[in-house]
């Protein structure tokens, strides 16, 4: 007899259970786990934000924010609803993008592995849109708002 957390078990039963456990420990879907371990979407999102920031440096941050940032007056009067999405990928300064991307790199791989690529992408985009809508609702009409902070806070909320 072998002492076990649930009492005593015979040696043959323990050996048989161990053999069955070793036989069934393979992956259910071969190769899928390896693909999910690569945080592709996280790196793509960081890349999009970085390229948008570098382009805005070349053209002028104020110009890019003026044309694509979340400005309630343009959404309310001109119906430029695309600004709610484009503002998520724009940033004011190197510190702004740096801290947002740092947190995205810290949280993204874990959440992407848990949720999968598609649901992680939807989480990021919908949380970013939610942040932009909140900014739209609570900001003065002439204020410009940009950044992935709403999406980042959505990712933090998903960890809870």
Model-derived regions, located:
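N-terminal TM1-TM2 helical hairpin plus the immediately adjacent luminal interfacial "cap"
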Residues: 38-148
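Solvent-exposed, charged/polar functional surfaces in cytosolic regulatory/catalytic domains
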Residues: 16, 110, 159
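Cytosolic juxtamembrane regions of integral membrane proteins
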Residues: 3-41
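Short intrinsically disordered, low-complexity coil segments enriched in acidic
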Residues: 1-8, 93, 100, 156
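Membrane-interface micro-motifs in multi-pass membrane enzymes
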Residues: 144-160
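Solvent-exposed, non-transmembrane amphipathic alpha-helical segments
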Residues: 16, 21, 29-34, 71, ...
């Amino acid at each position: 007899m072998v002492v076990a957390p649930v009492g005593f078990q015979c040696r043959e039963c323990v050996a048989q259970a161990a053999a069955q456990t070793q036989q069934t420990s393979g992956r259910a879907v071969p190769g899928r786990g390896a693909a999910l371990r690569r945080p592709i979407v996280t790196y793509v999102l960081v890349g999009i934000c970085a390229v948008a920031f570098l382009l805005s440096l070349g053209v002028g941050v104020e110009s890019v924010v003026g044309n694509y940032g979340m400005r309630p007056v343009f959404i309310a009067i001109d119906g430029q609803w695309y600004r709610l999405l484009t503002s998520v990928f724009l940033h004011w300064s190197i510190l702004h993008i740096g801290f947002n991307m740092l947190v995205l790199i810290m949280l993204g791989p874990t959440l992407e592995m848990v949720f999968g690529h598609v649901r992680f992408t939807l989480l990021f985009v919908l949380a970013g849109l939610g942040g932009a809508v909140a900014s739209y609702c609570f900001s003065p009409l002439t204020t410009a708002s940009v950044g992935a902070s709403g999406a980042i806070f959505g990712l933090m909320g998903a960890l809870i």
